[in-house]
Amino acid sequence: MTNLSQTFKDFFIHCTQDPEYKHEIQRKLFHILTIAWLPIAYIFLAKKTMLYIIYPMAILVIATDFYRHKNIFIGKVFHFAFGHILRESEFEENSWTGATFMAISAVIVFTICPKTIAICAFFILAVSDCLAALVGKKMTSKEFFEKSVAGSTAFGISALIILILCGIFNHEGLAYYFFGIFAVFATTIIEARPSFLDLDDNLTIPLVFSSIMMFFGLVWSLNY
């Protein structure tokens, strides 16, 4: 047990001493905090109430992201607050941050999809996407499309766990798990090969997962 604890301690120290990886940890912690509250809130709130929250939030996020390029004051405040977690590409003129794509996907998924699917999709975005990045960047493994075997494995396994937990919590039937496994597999492939759709993963991950679940739900007349 002591050796195991020391191993994790050494790994943590090594990670935090790597500037690039430390930056990624900061990004992903922010990623989890800004996304996970959505499915958590939806567990306790009605759909109508949730949409009253999401729509103004999406407008605020998109407007801020747009005007940071147009207004010097907004740009300075934005980059002072969030500059340390942005990627280099997000500093470019007329670029959009991941928050904008997350806001767009939240509006679409929470408006159209049943509660269980929306909750599951955004827990996968918050947790699985984070694990894929952190594990994939730190653990040496073979390539899997444009990512790594380690990162994609972390994504797929964590997404399956989320799928199962959401299903148990909402008392879903076997069809949910059967089609959910297929949706998780497809989403893992899309996450590992972003050039296939060439869109931000804050958009593709929840939309691909929920679209597949909705498709099977409509074809087989399922009520998730």
Where is each model-derived feature located?
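Interhelical loop and helix-boundary elements at the membrane-water interface
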Residues: 2-53, 65-169, 174-224
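Aromatic-rich transmembrane-lumenal/periplasmic boundary elements in polytopic membrane proteins
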Residues: 56-59
